[in-house]
Each structure stands twice: as C-alpha cells, then as structure tokens.
Amino acid sequence: MNEINRQNYPSILQSFGIVGMVFISMACFIPLNYFLNHQVGKEISMLVYYILSTGVPAFIIYFIRKKKVGEVHIILNIGNRRVLVLALVGTIALLLGIISPIVTSIPMPESFKKVFLELGKMNGFLSILLAVLAAPILEEFIFRGIVLDGLLKRYSPMKSILVSSLLFGLVHLNPWQFITGFTMGVFIGYVYLNTRSLLLAMLMHSTNNLIGTVQMQFTDMESILNKTLIEIYGGLINLIIAIVGSVLVFAVCMYYLKIEFKKLEPLVQNSPIDIPLTDQN
C-alpha cells in the first residue's frame, strides 16, 4: 500500500512544483501577450495568454500523471441536483457575506488599485468567457482534478484539501485573491472530496467568478476601492445583516450537504480514488 501511494502523483513537494511550472509558463508567454495586446487588443490577447499560459502546463501535468499512474479518472457528471443547488448557494453565501468583507477590509496600495481598475475595464464578451468558462475549467482541472485528486491518494483529506487550497490561492499572486482562492478552494475541495465531481467544482468556481464579473460590470469599481467596508455595505447595520445572513445560509447549506453526502458514501467509496486513513510518505 505504501509503495502504491508513493507512485501516486503528485506529492506535496510535486504539487509545489506544479505551481512553479504554472508560474514559469506565465512568464514565458508574457512576450506573446505584449505582442498581441498591440495587435488585436487587450481582451483577445488576455484570453489567448491565459489559455496558453495555464493550458500548456495543464496538459504537461496531465501527461506526467498519466505516465506515473497509468490512468486519470475525471468525473464530469453531477448526479445529485440537490448537491448542485446547495453547493452553488453555499458558494454565493460564502463569497458575498464572508470572504468579501474580509478581503474588502484589507488596505490596497494604489498600484494594485490601478491593476484591478484596468481589469474592470475589460468587460466585453471575451473577458466574461475567460472568467466564467476558461478559468474554471483549466484551474479546476489542475488544482482539483490533478493536485487534490493525487494528494487524496497519499495524505489525509484535511491535509490534501488545505495544501491544494493554499496552492490555488498562491497562484493568484496577490493577498486579496489569495484569501478568496484559499477559502473558496477549501469549500470546493470539501465538495469534491464527497462527490468526486470535477464538473461540480468547475460550476462552483464559475459561480464565484461570475459574481465578481457582475460586480465589475454594474458597480463603480473606483468608488468601491476608495470606500471603507461599512460604506460599501451602506452602514454598519447592513453589514451585520449581510454577514449574519450569509453565515446562516452557508451553515444551512453545509448541514444539508452533509446529509446528501452520506447518501453518496457508497458511490464515493467505490470511486477510483482510494483515500488513506493516515498520511503516507
């Protein structure tokens, strides 16, 4: 059993190597992004850059995993619609009432404000396509389909989810998106652990990004970035109601998700992922 686990890919160290591979790929494609930016515009260049800089390492990682393990199981089926609804509602509650207040309360330097404002200006169809389709597919394939899936075969579920979420947060390269990536990664990882559905993970990620995209489309980002947390929510009472309400909604979703997951246990136990009871080195 120990020998089998050592052959599974990736280990924690190899998972950090995967993130390093993504960073190297991002750096290598910067010249292409710069060139396309001047030839076809920011939105097309950003979409092409993202697909190549994330897609190339995704394929490399996939073939490494396939070579080491022999077979890569990817479940693109949701199965239980109740789990889908609870997971998506939980995603919205977690983002709007828990993550957003934390992220908004962290001061942002002017240099980062300019970056976020520039991103907010890219509000065409291709930018939406990148945020709600390309990013969820490629990032979930890497961080849940390969990294978390492999870690679950070598380590305990808690360690596997925390490590994969940490790496998912780090790849976003700034503290504000790190908090969102890590926290949302833990929730998505928990749902993936109990369903093995990569499609469900992608839909949760897409929902998270869609909310952010809608906020950029229909709000004055410059005004929001210069307001305090209480001002953004329109007063302390509104902030408290938003947080308490979201926490309650999220708690209800978690309660019913646990009930649904118990029903799925026989199917999950017969899935291709063999989860060790203790960590394997």
Per-range role (PLM):
Residues 1-9:
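Short, Lys/Arg-rich, polar N-terminal cytosolic tail immediately upstream
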Residues 12-20, 47-48, 84-87, 125, ...:
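Hydrophobic alpha-helical transmembrane segments
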Residues 18-66:
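Alpha-helical transmembrane segments in multi-pass membrane proteins
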Residues 27-30, 177-233:
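Functionally important transmembrane alpha-helices
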Residues 44, 70-135, 149, 153, ...:
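Juxtamembrane helix-loop-helix connectors linking adjacent transmembrane helices
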Residues 51, 128-133, 137, 162-166, ...:
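Residue-level signature of the transmembrane alpha-helical core
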Residues 138-163, 190-197:
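Membrane-interface helix/loop boundary segments of multi-pass membrane proteins
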Residues 208-281:
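C-terminal membrane module of polytopic membrane proteins
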